[in-house]
């Protein structure tokens, strides 16, 4: 996902937040933010589907042009302007009863869907493909994949935390140390968000995204 663009004169800040939700469950949030110009558009179709599912969206991926995919339940999908190959893969997986584990898509043409334990399909960076093939051969369970518009990527399995560069890997490792088992993560051209068992850690994300997470 990459739906924010940096504005001139951005200033980084660090903040630690503890949120108290309506049900009194406290979700620790910690990380760094920057001031971004939010250019996300055209998300009404996807949000309408999420409303039809009573807010129960399990997975999702968005681009800065408003294209994206949301997943409900095992493999129920709704998408807007998804790449034809990506859409065909999603339809086939649903028809075959495969459980979708992770999805990602970019405006620049990258896309990937992980299903079952470690099967996957998509158009992805060469280095990422090499990593996924190795994890598939090792029979590792692939939990999550993410790709940014400029080709940064991350992979989370039951044995490895992999990223396209040392900065991405460092964020994943720090998140695990702070909040335990990593469940999902998203990498953009500039930032990373990691959802762990006991909290959420983020690096260099838009202040607007931080505010949205605080409001959950």
Segment roles from a protein language model:
Residues 2-216:
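Trp/Gly-enriched beta-strand/coil motifs that build multi-repeat beta-propeller-like domains
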């Amino acid at each position: 996902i990459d739906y924010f663009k940096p504005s001139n004169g951005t200033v980084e800040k660090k903040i630690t937040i503890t949120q108290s939700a309506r049900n009194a469950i406290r979700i620790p949030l910690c990380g760094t933010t920057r001031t971004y110009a939010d250019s996300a558009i055209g998300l009404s179709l996807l949000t309408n589907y999420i409303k039809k599912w009573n807010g129960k969206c399990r997975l999702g991926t968005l681009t800065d042009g408003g294209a994206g995919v949301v997943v409900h339940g095992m493999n129920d999908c709704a998408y807007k302007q998804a790449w034809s190959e990506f859409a065909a893969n999603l339809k086939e997986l649903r028809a075959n009863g495969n459980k979708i584990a992770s999805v990602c898509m970019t405006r620049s043409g990258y896309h990937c869907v992980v299903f079952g334990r470690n099967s996957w399909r998509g158009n992805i960076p060469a280095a990422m493909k090499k990593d996924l093939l190795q994890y598939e051969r090792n029979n590792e369970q692939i939990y999550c994949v993410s790709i940014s518009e400029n080709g940064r990527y991350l992979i989370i399995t039951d044995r490895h935390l992999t990223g396209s560069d040392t900065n991405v890997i460092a964020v994943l490792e720090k998140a695990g140390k702070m909040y335990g088992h990593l469940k999902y993560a998203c990498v953009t051209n500039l930032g990373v968000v990691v959802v762990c068992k006991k909290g959420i850690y983020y690096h260099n994300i838009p202040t607007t995204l931080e505010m949205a997470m605080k409001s959950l």
